From Swiss-Prot:
It comes from Salmonella typhimurium (strain 14028s / SGSC 2262). This is Antitoxin TacA2. Keywords: DNA-binding, Repressor, Toxin-antitoxin system, Transcription, Transcription regulation. The gene is tacA2. One of its GO terms (biological process) is regulation of DNA-templated transcription. Residues 58-97 are annotated as: Neutralization domain. InterPro entries: Ribbon_hlx_hlx, TacA_1-like. PANTHER family: COPG FAMILY HELIX-TURN-HELIX PROTEIN-RELATED-RELATED, CYTOPLASMIC PROTEIN.
Length: 97
């Protein structure tokens, strides 16, 4: 079983060309977070990658379904208690602290 675990934990190598000043900045930030350079860079890159992919969510629809979607977006919503509450609640940036 140790062989299977070691295979699952194996990491690939990623080489980067970086200016010394940038490397020093990353090292200082990693130290401030109590991490080594590799873990700090990997964590930051992974977070940025996940954010980029979340922002790029794509919904696929055939032309008829997309047209129906647009029609529904243009329709005036029926009044209801939840909508009234939402419209009467100040936005977070409008609320007094």
């Amino acid at each position: 079983m140790p062989a299977a675990n070691s295979m699952a934990m194996k990491r690939e190598t990623l080489n980067l060309r970086i200016k010394p000043a940038e490397r020093d900045l990353i090292d200082r930030a990693a130290k401030a977070r109590g991490k080594n350079r590799t873990d700090f860079v990997l964590e930051a890159a992974r977070a940025a990658a996940e954010e980029a992919l979340i922002e790029q969510r794509i919904i696929m629809a055939d032309p008829e379904a997309y047209q129906e979607f647009l029609v529904r977006l243009d329709q005036t919503p029926s009044p209801n208690a939840a909508l009234r509450k939402t419209m009467q609640t100040p936005a977070p940036w409008e609320q007094e602290k």
